[in-house]
């Protein structure tokens, strides 16, 4: 394998984390450090767990970390919905972020399936 940096799902998840940092740098997030921190942590957790999983010695270990990444992605989606509902950003931003989260989730599902099938 060529390493985690070659995984498209890692690349997309990292790009999403960078986008989240940019979005949460301004506006209402300036005064809500709690939610901003939670959103950022969840966003960074996704590519971090993909990377850690890919570098593990066994597929079983890798899959465990990929599931953790999926969990962090669901956490991120929930927090983004809350941020939108309390007026931190508009629906267009939410839809864009949700679409990317769904793509990453599908890619993680495929990666889990592929790595689970390898013995």
Can you describe what each PLM-predicted range is?
Residues 1-119:
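Short, C-terminally biased terminal segments at protein or domain edges
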């Amino acid at each position: 394998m060529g390493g985690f940096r070659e995984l498209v799902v890692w690349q997309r998840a990292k790009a999403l984390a960078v986008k989240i940092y940019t979005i949460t740098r301004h506006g209402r997030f300036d005064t809500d450090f709690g939610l901003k921190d939670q959103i950022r942590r969840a966003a960074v957790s996704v590519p971090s767990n993909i990377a850690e999983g890919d570098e593990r010695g066994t597929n079983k270990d890798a899959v465990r970390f990929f599931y953790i990444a999926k969990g962090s992605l669901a956490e991120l989606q929930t927090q983004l919905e809350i941020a939108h509902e309390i007026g931190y950003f508009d629906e267009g931003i939410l839809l864009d972020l949700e679409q990317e989260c769904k793509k990453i989730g599908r890619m993680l599902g495929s990666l889990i399936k592929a790595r689970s099938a390898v013995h």
